Curated annotation (Swiss-Prot):
GO BP term, pick one: tRNA splicing, via endonucleolytic cleavage and ligation
Binding site residues for GMP: 226-230, 353-354, 402-405, 409, 428-431, 504
Active-site residues annotated for this sequence: H428
Keywords per UniProt: Cytoplasm, GTP-binding, Ligase, Manganese, Metal-binding, Nucleotide-binding, Nucleus, tRNA processing
Cofactors named for this entry: Mn(2+)
Enzyme class: ligase
Protein name, per record: RNA-splicing ligase RtcB homolog
GO annotations of cellular component type: cytoplasm; nucleus; tRNA-splicing ligase complex
Species this chain originates from: Xenopus tropicalis
Length: 505
């Protein structure tokens, strides 16, 4: 029996101006409470979605994000609370922008591929340059074209980096270390990657041959959907000290942002795991509120196989972003007729938005080992954390937040408050407000392209028809999302970037 909207509201209360609590009972079997972070406009979107669902309207076939946060709170072994970040929107199993941690000491605790997502280690890398906007504006069309020519983009795009089956096995195991050995990365690139660009538990034998077949031709490709490479300029600096540590010292400085993931390989790893886990759930008598939350005990063979395969797909994504960094450096080199080194094309940082990792956190005053699922959310560790690079020990970890086509992106830093409230996690981007299908119905791709041209943004798109799905109108306002995290204290604004050229799948 479904409840009325007013009945649903009985389970929700506001903790402070940017945070709501979802009390136990909102959905069956909740082990812990849920919370979600919003400001006024984002709050309105969340409650509208719930209201529509209680009238029988579905969001693109998914449950409303609030319900999904509640269903995650009912998973075995979850600890502290199920957390929705300001960019949260309905997804497969977990909402995108929903993170949760599971107690590794609890034999019942599970791992759920729906808590990582199909694009394993979809993430963002930011490069800086010593160029100024005035250097790039006159040649931005050539630069956009050079990047479009160098980086293979689009749905079925194939890579230009030579790769045999043996190379793929090594890349899956070694991550950025493979790129380094093959000459596609600089030694310091690795220092500025989450996990140093290599998850050590990766086991290529846990990646099916079907997944490898999908991944082999796609390495060093951008893919379609919300993936992009953008030439950006620094629009505002909120934290000069943190910005300086990142090599950003003035407005107008040019950067490059690369947003991509593990392509078809990661998708197949997730699909394979979901099939195996359905069987494991029957065997181990695990019940969940939503079939999409298929999971397995962390300690089970299925749980371990998935974590090892997921880590390999994660490594593939880091190699992918490294390959695209190599191609970007070549494109800049060609246009500006000088070496990437002379252009200071260094990696500021590289973060993952879809991953599960074993981490140490303090919960109720006790140090615990947890499996932290971050889906559509970003690790944001505070200053002095042992897992962040030496360069950022005093500022906190850089967090890269991609906007949507034609809107701003942000660099944030991690905080101590985020460490206690959200397991050192913050938002990842704008978060969809319209489903892809709805975007295609409501928006015309030519209008979207014209609007970008009006903003003075050079654009190269492999599949124009996909542009509507990624139009700024399809998304929540990234500034709302970032400000909510800043005001709530779970991350701190450092730099704002605006695009001048976009390359898209």
């Amino acid at each position: 029996m479904s409840r009325s909207y007013n009945d649903e509201l009985q389970y929700l209360d506001k903790i402070h101006k940017n945070c709501w609590r979802i009390r136990k009972g909102f959905v069956p079997n909740m082990q812990v409470e849920g919370v979600f972070y919003v400001n006024d406009p984002l709050e309105k979107l969340m409650f509208e979605e719930l209201r529509n669902a209680s009238r029988g309207g579905a969001a693109g076939g998914f449950l409303p994000a609030m319900k999904q946060i509640g269903n995650v709170a009912a998973l075995p072994g979850i600890i502290h609370r199920s957390i929705g970040l300001p960019d949260v929107h309905s997804g497969y199993g977990f909402a995108i922008g929903n993170m949760a941690a599971f107690d590794m000491d609890n034999p019942e605790a599970v791992v759920s591929p729906g808590g990582v997502g199909f694009d394993i280690n979809c993430g963002v890398r930011l490069l800086r340059t010593n160029l100024d906007e005035s250097d790039v504006q006159p040649v931005k069309e050539q630069l956009a074209q050079a990047m479009f020519d160098h980086i293979p983009v689009g749905v079925g795009s194939k890579g230009v980096i030579p790769m045999g089956a043996k190379d793929l096995e090594e890349a899956l195991e070694m991550g950025v270390d493979w790129s380094l050995r093959e000459g596609y990365a600089w030694a310091e690139d690795k220092e500025h990657c989450e996990e140093y660009g290599r998850m050590l538990q990766a086991d290529p034998s846990k990646v099916s041959s079907k997944a490898k077949k999908r991944g082999l031709p796609q390495l060093g490709t951008l893919g379609a959907g919300n993936h992009y490479a953008e030439v950006q300029v620094v629009d505002d600096i909120y934290d000069e000290y943190a910005a300086k540590k990142m090599g950003i010292d003035h407005k107008g400085q040019v950067c490059v942002m690369i947003h991509s993931g593990s392509r078809g390989l990661g998708h197949q790893v997730a699909t394979d795991a979901l099939v195996a886990m359905e069987k494991a759930m029957k065997r181990d008598k695990i019940t969940v509120n939503d079939r999409q939350l298929a999971c397995a005990r962390i300690s089970s063979a299925e749980g371990q196989d998935y974590l090892k395969g997921m880590a390999a797909a994660g490594n593939y994504a880091w190699v992918n972003r490294s390959s695209m960094t190599f191609l970007t450096r070549q494109a800049f080199s060609k246009v500006f007729n000088t070496t990437p080194d002379d252009l200071d094309l260094h990696v500021i940082y590289d973060v993952s938005h879809n991953i599960a990792k074993v981490e140490q956190h303090v919960v109720d005053g006790k140090e615990k080992t947890l499996l932290v699922h971050r889906k559509g959310s970003t690790r944001a560790f505070p200053p002095h954390h042992p897992l962040i690079p030496v360069d950022y020990q005093l500022t906190g970890q850089p967090v890269l937040i991609g906007g949507t086509m034609g809107t701003c992106s942000y660099v944030l830093t991690g905080t101590d408050q985020g460490m206690t409230e959200t397991f050192g996690t913050t938002c990842h981007g704008a978060g969809r407000a319209l489903s892809r299908a709805k975007s295609r119905r409501n928006l015309d791709f030519q209008d979207v392209l014209d609007k970008l041209a009006d903003l003075g943004i050079a654009i190269r798109v492999a599949s124009p028809k996909l542009v509507m799905e990624e139009a700024p109108e399809s998304y929540k306002n990234v500034t709302d999302v970032v400000n909510t995290c800043h005001d709530a204290g779970i991350s701190k604004k450092a730099i704002k970037l605006r695009p001048i050229a976009v390359i898209k799948g």
